[in-house]
Design a protein with these regions (language model features):
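A short loop-to-beta-strand scaffold at the N-terminal edge of the catalytic core in hydrolase folds
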Residues: 15-25
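Conserved hydrolase catalytic core segment
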Residues: 109-152
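Conserved serine/cysteine hydrolase catalytic core
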Residues: 205-265
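Catalytic histidine-centered segment of alpha/beta-hydrolase-like enzymes
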Residues: 281-291
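Conserved alpha/beta-hydrolase catalytic His-Asp/Glu region
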Residues: 169-223
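Conserved HGGG/HGGXW glycine-rich cap/lid loop of the alpha/beta-hydrolase fold
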Residues: 26-80
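Catalytic histidine neighborhood in serine/cysteine hydrolases
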Residues: 269-283
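Active-site loop/oxyanion-hole signature of alpha/beta-hydrolase fold enzymes
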Residues: 14-16, 49, 55, 66-115, ...
Length: 303
Protein backbone atom coordinates (compact mmCIF):
# COMPACT_ATOMS: atom_id res chain seq x y z
CA UNK A 1 0.00 0.00 0.00
CA UNK A 2 1.63 3.26 -1.14
CA UNK A 3 -0.99 5.50 0.47
CA UNK A 4 -2.65 5.13 3.86
CA UNK A 5 -6.35 4.69 4.46
CA UNK A 6 -8.09 7.11 6.82
CA UNK A 7 -10.36 5.57 9.46
CA UNK A 8 -12.22 7.00 12.46
CA UNK A 9 -13.46 5.72 15.77
CA UNK A 10 -15.26 7.24 18.75
CA UNK A 11 -13.50 7.67 22.08
CA UNK A 12 -15.08 8.51 25.41
CA UNK A 13 -14.25 11.58 27.48
CA UNK A 14 -15.80 13.29 30.50
CA UNK A 15 -18.11 15.38 28.29
CA UNK A 16 -19.29 12.51 26.08
CA UNK A 17 -17.40 11.23 23.05
CA UNK A 18 -15.09 12.56 20.39
CA UNK A 19 -14.01 11.15 17.05
CA UNK A 20 -10.37 10.29 16.41
CA UNK A 21 -8.91 9.72 12.98
CA UNK A 22 -6.05 7.38 12.22
CA UNK A 23 -4.06 6.55 9.09
CA UNK A 24 -3.53 2.85 8.43
CA UNK A 25 -0.80 1.41 6.24
CA UNK A 26 -0.03 -2.15 5.22
CA UNK A 27 -2.23 -5.20 5.69
CA UNK A 28 -5.29 -4.58 7.83
CA UNK A 29 -5.25 -8.14 9.17
CA UNK A 30 -1.53 -8.28 9.99
CA UNK A 31 -0.92 -9.41 13.57
CA UNK A 32 2.26 -7.33 13.92
CA UNK A 33 1.19 -3.75 14.68
CA UNK A 34 3.38 -0.65 14.78
CA UNK A 35 1.70 2.38 16.36
CA UNK A 36 3.33 5.71 15.41
CA UNK A 37 2.30 8.70 17.54
CA UNK A 38 3.27 12.24 16.61
CA UNK A 39 4.43 15.33 18.50
CA UNK A 40 2.41 18.10 20.14
CA UNK A 41 1.39 20.18 17.12
CA UNK A 42 1.86 17.53 14.46
CA UNK A 43 -0.37 14.85 12.88
CA UNK A 44 -0.24 11.26 11.68
CA UNK A 45 1.05 12.03 8.17
CA UNK A 46 4.40 12.89 9.77
CA UNK A 47 5.26 9.20 9.43
CA UNK A 48 4.60 8.77 5.69
CA UNK A 49 8.25 8.37 4.70
CA UNK A 50 8.99 6.02 7.57
CA UNK A 51 5.86 3.96 6.86
CA UNK A 52 6.78 3.39 3.22
CA UNK A 53 10.35 2.43 4.12
CA UNK A 54 9.22 0.10 6.89
CA UNK A 55 6.66 -1.68 4.72
CA UNK A 56 9.14 -2.09 1.89
CA UNK A 57 11.78 -3.55 4.22
CA UNK A 58 9.22 -5.88 5.83
CA UNK A 59 8.08 -7.08 2.41
CA UNK A 60 11.67 -7.99 1.50
CA UNK A 61 11.73 -10.13 4.65
CA UNK A 62 8.39 -11.71 3.77
CA UNK A 63 6.68 -10.14 6.77
CA UNK A 64 3.26 -8.51 7.12
CA UNK A 65 2.83 -5.30 9.08
CA UNK A 66 -0.05 -3.05 10.07
CA UNK A 67 1.13 0.52 10.68
CA UNK A 68 -1.28 2.85 12.43
CA UNK A 69 -0.64 6.59 12.70
CA UNK A 70 -3.36 8.40 14.67
CA UNK A 71 -4.18 12.09 14.55
CA UNK A 72 -4.26 12.75 18.28
CA UNK A 73 -7.52 14.48 19.26
CA UNK A 74 -7.48 18.19 18.45
CA UNK A 75 -5.26 17.61 15.44
CA UNK A 76 -5.62 16.69 11.78
CA UNK A 77 -8.71 14.66 10.95
CA UNK A 78 -9.77 14.26 14.60
CA UNK A 79 -12.39 16.25 16.49
CA UNK A 80 -11.59 19.26 18.64
CA UNK A 81 -12.53 18.78 22.29
CA UNK A 82 -15.36 20.79 23.79
CA UNK A 83 -13.42 21.05 27.06
CA UNK A 84 -9.86 22.27 26.36
CA UNK A 85 -8.77 21.15 29.83
CA UNK A 86 -8.87 17.59 28.47
CA UNK A 87 -5.96 18.26 26.13
CA UNK A 88 -3.51 16.36 28.30
CA UNK A 89 -1.62 13.04 28.25
CA UNK A 90 -4.14 10.96 30.19
CA UNK A 91 -6.83 11.76 27.61
CA UNK A 92 -4.47 10.82 24.81
CA UNK A 93 -3.49 7.59 26.58
CA UNK A 94 -7.13 6.57 26.99
CA UNK A 95 -7.71 7.25 23.28
CA UNK A 96 -4.75 5.05 22.30
CA UNK A 97 -6.05 2.27 24.55
CA UNK A 98 -9.45 2.55 22.84
CA UNK A 99 -7.81 2.54 19.41
CA UNK A 100 -5.75 -0.56 20.18
CA UNK A 101 -8.79 -2.39 21.54
CA UNK A 102 -10.66 -1.56 18.33
CA UNK A 103 -7.77 -2.71 16.15
CA UNK A 104 -7.51 -5.92 18.16
CA UNK A 105 -11.22 -6.57 17.63
CA UNK A 106 -10.76 -6.13 13.87
CA UNK A 107 -7.77 -8.50 13.73
CA UNK A 108 -5.89 -9.94 16.75
CA UNK A 109 -2.68 -8.12 17.66
CA UNK A 110 0.17 -10.55 18.35
CA UNK A 111 2.95 -7.96 18.74
CA UNK A 112 2.74 -4.24 19.45
CA UNK A 113 5.61 -1.84 18.80
CA UNK A 114 5.38 1.89 19.55
CA UNK A 115 7.15 4.78 17.80
CA UNK A 116 6.63 8.04 19.67
CA UNK A 117 7.99 11.45 18.72
CA UNK A 118 8.07 13.98 21.57
CA UNK A 119 4.48 13.98 22.94
CA UNK A 120 3.90 10.64 21.23
CA UNK A 121 6.79 9.26 23.25
CA UNK A 122 5.33 10.57 26.49
CA UNK A 123 2.08 8.76 25.70
CA UNK A 124 4.15 5.70 24.80
CA UNK A 125 5.95 5.72 28.15
CA UNK A 126 2.61 5.96 29.96
CA UNK A 127 1.27 3.02 27.93
CA UNK A 128 4.37 0.85 28.30
CA UNK A 129 4.45 1.40 32.06
CA UNK A 130 0.87 0.09 32.37
CA UNK A 131 0.81 -3.02 30.13
CA UNK A 132 -2.22 -4.47 31.93
CA UNK A 133 -4.37 -1.72 30.38
CA UNK A 134 -3.41 -2.68 26.81
CA UNK A 135 -4.69 -5.52 24.65
CA UNK A 136 -1.05 -6.44 24.12
CA UNK A 137 1.98 -5.09 26.04
CA UNK A 138 4.38 -2.84 24.16
CA UNK A 139 7.15 -5.11 22.88
CA UNK A 140 9.48 -2.47 21.46
CA UNK A 141 9.36 1.22 22.37
CA UNK A 142 11.10 3.82 20.24
CA UNK A 143 11.36 7.21 21.93
CA UNK A 144 12.18 10.00 19.49
CA UNK A 145 13.89 12.86 21.33
CA UNK A 146 11.88 12.56 24.52
CA UNK A 147 12.25 11.11 27.98
CA UNK A 148 10.88 11.38 31.50
CA UNK A 149 13.06 14.38 32.32
CA UNK A 150 12.76 17.31 29.92
CA UNK A 151 14.66 20.58 29.77
CA UNK A 152 12.70 23.62 30.91
CA UNK A 153 14.40 25.76 28.25
CA UNK A 154 13.13 23.42 25.53
CA UNK A 155 9.60 23.36 26.93
CA UNK A 156 9.59 27.15 27.27
CA UNK A 157 10.47 27.47 23.60
CA UNK A 158 7.62 25.16 22.59
CA UNK A 159 5.31 27.12 24.90
CA UNK A 160 6.28 30.31 23.05
CA UNK A 161 5.03 29.17 19.65
CA UNK A 162 2.28 26.57 20.12
CA UNK A 163 -1.07 28.06 19.16
CA UNK A 164 0.62 31.07 17.56
CA UNK A 165 1.01 32.07 13.92
CA UNK A 166 -1.24 32.53 10.94
CA UNK A 167 -3.47 32.89 9.15
CA UNK A 168 -1.34 32.75 6.02
CA UNK A 169 -2.16 34.05 2.55
CA UNK A 170 -0.99 30.83 0.92
CA UNK A 171 0.02 27.30 1.78
CA UNK A 172 3.58 28.11 0.71
CA UNK A 173 3.72 31.05 3.12
CA UNK A 174 2.68 28.80 5.99
CA UNK A 175 5.21 26.14 5.09
CA UNK A 176 7.96 28.77 4.87
CA UNK A 177 7.03 30.15 8.29
CA UNK A 178 7.32 26.68 9.81
CA UNK A 179 10.81 26.36 8.37
CA UNK A 180 11.91 29.12 10.72
CA UNK A 181 9.95 27.95 13.76
CA UNK A 182 11.02 24.34 13.37
CA UNK A 183 14.67 24.85 12.48
CA UNK A 184 15.48 22.12 15.00
CA UNK A 185 14.09 19.57 12.54
CA UNK A 186 17.41 19.88 10.72
CA UNK A 187 18.20 20.12 7.00
CA UNK A 188 15.60 19.01 4.45
CA UNK A 189 15.23 19.58 0.73
CA UNK A 190 12.44 21.92 -0.35
CA UNK A 191 10.44 18.92 -1.55
CA UNK A 192 10.92 17.03 1.73
CA UNK A 193 9.86 20.09 3.71
CA UNK A 194 6.74 20.59 1.60
CA UNK A 195 5.66 16.94 1.86
CA UNK A 196 6.29 16.91 5.61
CA UNK A 197 4.49 20.16 6.40
CA UNK A 198 1.70 20.59 3.84
CA UNK A 199 -0.60 18.43 6.03
CA UNK A 200 -0.01 20.92 8.85
CA UNK A 201 -2.43 23.39 7.24
CA UNK A 202 -6.04 23.62 6.18
CA UNK A 203 -7.76 26.29 4.11
CA UNK A 204 -10.40 28.37 5.83
CA UNK A 205 -13.69 29.58 4.40
CA UNK A 206 -12.16 32.94 3.43
CA UNK A 207 -9.32 31.30 1.52
CA UNK A 208 -6.52 31.86 4.02
CA UNK A 209 -4.50 28.99 5.48
CA UNK A 210 -4.41 28.08 9.16
CA UNK A 211 -2.83 25.35 11.25
CA UNK A 212 -4.71 22.05 11.36
CA UNK A 213 -4.79 21.87 15.15
CA UNK A 214 -7.05 23.39 17.78
CA UNK A 215 -5.23 26.45 19.21
CA UNK A 216 -6.62 25.43 22.60
CA UNK A 217 -4.01 22.66 22.86
CA UNK A 218 -1.75 25.49 24.05
CA UNK A 219 -3.80 25.80 27.26
CA UNK A 220 -2.04 22.74 28.65
CA UNK A 221 1.09 24.90 28.77
CA UNK A 222 -0.58 27.85 30.50
CA UNK A 223 0.21 26.67 34.02
CA UNK A 224 3.52 25.05 33.14
CA UNK A 225 6.52 26.38 35.02
CA UNK A 226 10.01 25.19 35.82
CA UNK A 227 8.73 23.91 39.17
CA UNK A 228 5.78 21.99 37.70
CA UNK A 229 8.08 20.58 35.02
CA UNK A 230 10.33 19.17 37.75
CA UNK A 231 7.32 17.67 39.54
CA UNK A 232 6.05 16.10 36.34
CA UNK A 233 9.51 14.78 35.61
CA UNK A 234 9.60 12.95 38.93
CA UNK A 235 6.28 11.26 38.16
CA UNK A 236 7.40 10.29 34.66
CA UNK A 237 10.73 9.02 35.99
CA UNK A 238 8.94 6.62 38.34
CA UNK A 239 6.85 5.36 35.41
CA UNK A 240 9.87 5.05 33.14
CA UNK A 241 11.56 2.80 35.67
CA UNK A 242 8.58 0.41 35.45
CA UNK A 243 8.95 -0.09 31.69
CA UNK A 244 10.22 -3.49 30.57
CA UNK A 245 9.79 -3.05 26.80
CA UNK A 246 12.89 -3.18 24.63
CA UNK A 247 13.62 0.55 24.25
CA UNK A 248 15.55 2.59 21.69
CA UNK A 249 16.13 6.30 22.30
CA UNK A 250 16.87 8.63 19.40
CA UNK A 251 18.23 12.04 20.36
CA UNK A 252 18.90 15.00 18.14
CA UNK A 253 22.46 15.94 19.08
CA UNK A 254 21.41 19.61 19.24
CA UNK A 255 18.14 18.98 21.09
CA UNK A 256 16.99 21.68 23.49
CA UNK A 257 14.32 19.43 24.96
CA UNK A 258 16.25 16.28 25.86
CA UNK A 259 19.70 16.98 27.27
CA UNK A 260 22.54 14.55 26.72
CA UNK A 261 22.78 14.10 30.48
CA UNK A 262 19.13 13.06 30.73
CA UNK A 263 19.44 10.81 27.70
CA UNK A 264 22.45 9.01 29.18
CA UNK A 265 20.55 8.57 32.45
CA UNK A 266 17.84 6.73 30.52
CA UNK A 267 20.38 4.10 29.47
CA UNK A 268 21.14 3.24 33.09
CA UNK A 269 17.68 2.71 34.61
CA UNK A 270 14.28 1.24 33.80
CA UNK A 271 14.38 -0.40 30.37
CA UNK A 272 18.00 0.77 29.91
CA UNK A 273 17.33 2.35 26.56
CA UNK A 274 19.89 2.04 23.81
CA UNK A 275 20.87 5.57 22.77
CA UNK A 276 21.56 6.78 19.24
CA UNK A 277 22.43 10.45 18.75
CA UNK A 278 21.80 12.09 15.38
CA UNK A 279 24.20 14.83 14.33
CA UNK A 280 22.97 18.13 12.91
CA UNK A 281 19.45 17.74 14.31
CA UNK A 282 17.69 19.32 17.27
CA UNK A 283 14.14 18.67 18.42
CA UNK A 284 12.98 16.52 16.88
CA UNK A 285 14.33 14.16 14.22
CA UNK A 286 11.67 13.87 11.50
CA UNK A 287 12.55 10.30 10.49
CA UNK A 288 12.77 11.38 6.86
CA UNK A 289 16.51 11.17 6.16
CA UNK A 290 17.90 7.69 5.51
CA UNK A 291 20.38 7.94 8.39
CA UNK A 292 17.42 8.48 10.74
CA UNK A 293 15.22 5.78 9.21
CA UNK A 294 17.83 3.01 9.15
CA UNK A 295 18.16 2.59 12.94
CA UNK A 296 14.36 2.54 13.21
CA UNK A 297 14.09 -0.25 10.65
CA UNK A 298 16.88 -2.20 12.34
CA UNK A 299 15.16 -1.88 15.70
CA UNK A 300 11.64 -2.76 14.59
CA UNK A 301 12.44 -5.49 12.08
CA UNK A 302 15.15 -7.45 13.83
CA UNK A 303 14.10 -11.01 14.79
Amino acid sequence: MTEPQLHHLHCKDSTGTHRMGYWQWGQSDAQAVVLCVHGLTRQGRDFDVLARALLQAAQVQGRSLRLVCPDVVGRGSSDWLTDPALYQPLTYLADMQTLLADLHAQAPIATLDWVGTSMGGIIGMLAAAQPQALVQPVRRLLLNDVGPQLSWAGLARIKSYVGQGGPFDSLQAGIAALRQTLAGFGPHTDEQWHVLNAPMFKQGAEGSWVFHYDPAIALAFAGLSEATNQQGGQIMQALYEQITADTLLLRGADSELLSRENALAMTACGPRARLIELAGVGHAPTLVASEQIEPVLDFLLRP
